Amino acid sequence: MMRRGDVYLADLSPVQGSEQGGIRPVVIIQNDTGNKYSPTVIVAAITGRINKAKIPTHVEIEKSKYKLDKDSVILLEQIRTLDKNRLKEKLTYLSDKKMKEVNNAIDISLGLHTIRSHKA
């Protein structure tokens, strides 16, 4: 069974505009109850283009620690729901420490955690 924090290769095509596409790694961010019973799964895209602007919704992952082809970045602003049939093969899983970074970036992406106060 797939678990929250697992990294899979997934087929993200077709896409529109600035969405991440193609066959690429994704990290499962859906809870494990949903992973067990739902035909869909919530994931965040991973990119190997680490020269992208580092923003608070990005979490870096090292190739040597996570058995990836290159150092990569989880894009927690690129969250989407996929049919489980889009998942190809499990590559690795993230440590509890790394998942805490992912959780923080999700909080920021969804506005659950404010970076700075916004005064009206």
Swiss-Prot record:
Gene3D superfamilies in the cross-refs: 2.30.30.110
GO annotation, biological process: mRNA catabolic process; rRNA catabolic process
Keywords: Endonuclease, Hydrolase, Nuclease, RNA-binding, Toxin-antitoxin system
GO molecular function annotation: DNA binding; RNA binding; RNA endonuclease activity
InterPro entries, per the entry: PemK-like, Plasmid_toxin/cell-grow_inhib
EC top class, as a word: hydrolase
Coiled coil: none
tRNA-binding listed as a keyword: no
E.C. code: 3.1.-.-
SUPFAM superfamilies reported in the protein's UniProt record: Cell growth inhibitor/plasmid maintenance toxic component
Summary of the function given for this chain in its UniProt record: Toxic component of a type II toxin-antitoxin (TA) system. Ribosome-independent, sequence-specific endoribonuclease that cleaves mRNA, thus inhibiting protein synthesis and inducing bacterial stasis. It cuts between the first and nucleotides of 5'-UACAU-3' in single-stranded RNA. Neutralized by coexpression with cognate antitoxin MazE.
Subunit description: Forms a complex with MazE which is no longer active as an endoribonuclease.
Record family assignment: Belongs to the PemK/MazF family.
Name of protein: Endoribonuclease MazF
Annotated organism of origin: Staphylococcus saprophyticus subsp. saprophyticus (strain ATCC 15305 / DSM 20229 / NCIMB 8711 / NCTC 7292 / S-41)
